[in-house]
From Swiss-Prot:
Family listed: Belongs to the complex I 49 kDa subunit family.
Function recorded in the entry: NDH-1 shuttles electrons from NADH, via FMN and iron-sulfur (Fe-S) centers, to quinones in the respiratory chain. The immediate electron acceptor for the enzyme in this species is believed to be ubiquinone. Couples the redox reaction to proton translocation (for every two electrons transferred, four hydrogen ions are translocated across the cytoplasmic membrane), and thus conserves the redox energy in a proton gradient.
Gene from which the chain derives: nuoD
Xref: InterPro entries: NADH_Q_OxRdtase_suD, NADH_UbQ_OxRdtase_49kDa_CS, NDH1_su_D/H, NiFe-Hase_large
Alphabetized SUPFAM superfamilies for the sequence: HydB/Nqo4-like
HAMAP family: NDH1_NuoD (MF_01358)
Protein name: NADH-quinone oxidoreductase subunit D
EC number: 7.1.1.-
Lineage, broadest ranks: Bacteria, Pseudomonadati, Pseudomonadota, Betaproteobacteria, Burkholderiales
MF annotations from Gene Ontology: NAD binding; NADH:ubiquinone reductase (non-electrogenic) activity; quinone binding
Length: 417
């Protein structure tokens, strides 16, 4: 009698559900996955090596391009590592601005995730709803940094500039009538802080809309419940972090366990799952959006009442003001020197980790006393999660592989780096 053999299937890198350039070699018995072998490296850009030939400040934009959905949180890990080596104090206002933008970035990431994950599974409407809200937050990015995605807003010692007093408004055009324009600019008459406040006042209702579409949806539950189960013990052994480990019932969050900036002064909860399946990880991320709203509201309240500097007064690191530069020759020379030669960081090594929307994002920085890093190592959360894909997918159907890739929230910028 003829022997039945397993067959091999290439999933990606051109597959729309492969989240970028994932090539997954699946060994199948009928439609059941026996083995899943991820092939990475198709988006490798040598970020760690490039950083060795750039000054410390020139590498900030490279961080944006790692996980290109959670831009500012990547920058945060990098500048924290530099600040540890320099031993400089960051002004309190800058710390609150950083925390506020970390949470804005977390919401941006989770909106992209919920839209793409639902789209992969077959629910198209959520994607359109999620992008409606992302647009507002992208406008906030643009208001503070001039760029919608790659902001390069954080600086060693603080942030590039304070929150602007006026929120940019939409201009009249052929495709918009006056009524539509007035509606679009409704919340944009005040400052950037007013706009963010207005957004986070409206946002919980939007999260309710996503939950109405998904949480009790019979098809959604059939596709997610009991899929990709990871036990708490195994989650620890696999090195999972972020929503992946919290979905398995372990309340591990760097914002609580190893607080950085002002997270120890802010009141919020860590959502955890019970069963460790895709559905629990979905619920954890949805609740994280609500907690980010709480954190953002507290930051806004503090920032309204406490004006102050947003970058350190250490002039070895911080550039002079734009106004001073245009009137004072010494300031101009100082600015030129700082951006051509850069600042020198004392010899030593430091590890800084932040609670990234996807997990623990760490930067290990080694300095030999020069104006460039001697070695920069990036600890990307997605790398450990993708390593667990084989174990999570075994025994499931081929259609469930898409759900598992979606629940891991894979972005290849940080995995291949």
């Amino acid at each position: 009698m003829a022997e039945i053999k397993n067959y091999t299937l290439n999933f990606g890198p051109q597959h729309p559900a492969a989240h970028g350039v994932l090539r997954l070699v699946l060994e199948l018995d009928g439609e059941v996955i026996q083995r899943a072998d991820p092939h990475i490296g198709l988006l490798h850009r040598a970020t760690e090596k490039l950083a060795e030939s750039k000054t410390f400040i020139q590498s900030v934009p490279y961080m944006d391009r790692l996980d290109y959905v959670s831009m500012m949180v990547n920058e945060h890990g990098y500048v924290l590592a530099i600040e540890k080596l320099l031993g400089i104090e960051v002004p309190e206002r800058a710390q609150y601005i950083r925390v506020l933008f970390d949470e804005i970035t977390r919401v941006l990431n989770h909106l992209m995730w919920i839209g793409a994950h639902a789209l992969d599974v077959g629910a198209m409407a959520v994607f359109l709803y999620a992008f409606r809200e992302r647009e507002d937050l992208m406008d906030v990015y643009e208001a503070v940094s001039g760029a919608r995605m790659h902001a390069a807003y954080y600086r060693p010692g603080g942030v590039y500039r304070d929150l602007p007093e006026a929120m940019p408004q939409y201009k009249a055009s052929k495709i918009r009538n006056e009524r539509a324009l007035a509606k679009m600019n409704e919340a944009r008459s005040g400052s950037v802080l007013d706009f963010i406040d207005d957004f986070f006042t409206r946002f919980p209702k939007c999260v309710d809309e996503y939950e109405t579409l998904l949480t009790d949806n019979r098809i959604w539950k059939q596709r997610l419940v009991g899929i990709g189960v990871v036990s708490p013990e195994r989650a620890l052994q696999l090195g999972l972090t972020g929503p992946m480990i919290r979905g398995s019932g372990i309340a591990w969050d760097l914002r609580k366990k190893q607080p950085y900036e002002v997270y120890d002064r802010i009141d919020f909860d860590i959502p955890v799952g019970v069963n460790g399946d895709c559905y629990d990880r979905y619920l954890v991320r949805v609740e994280e959006m609500r907690q980010s709203t709480r954190i953002a509201k507290q930051c806004i309240e503090w920032l309204r009442e406490n004006p102050g500097p947003v970058i350190t007064d250490n002039h070895k690191v911080a550039p002079p003001s734009r106004v001073g530069m245009k009137t004072n020759m010494e300031d101009l020379i100082h600015h030129f020197k700082l951006f051509t030669e850069g600042f020198h960081v004392p010899e030593g090594e430091a590890y800084a980790a932040v609670e990234h929307p996807k997990g623990e994002f760490g930067i290990y920085l080694v300095s030999d006393g020069a104006n460039k890093p001697y070695r920069l190592k990036i600890r990307a959360p997605g790398y450990a999660h993708l390593s667990a894909l084989d174990e999570m997918a075994r025994g499931h159907m081929i259609a469930d592989a898409v759900t598992i890739i979606g629940t891991q929230d894979i972005v290849f910028g940080e995995i291949d780096r």
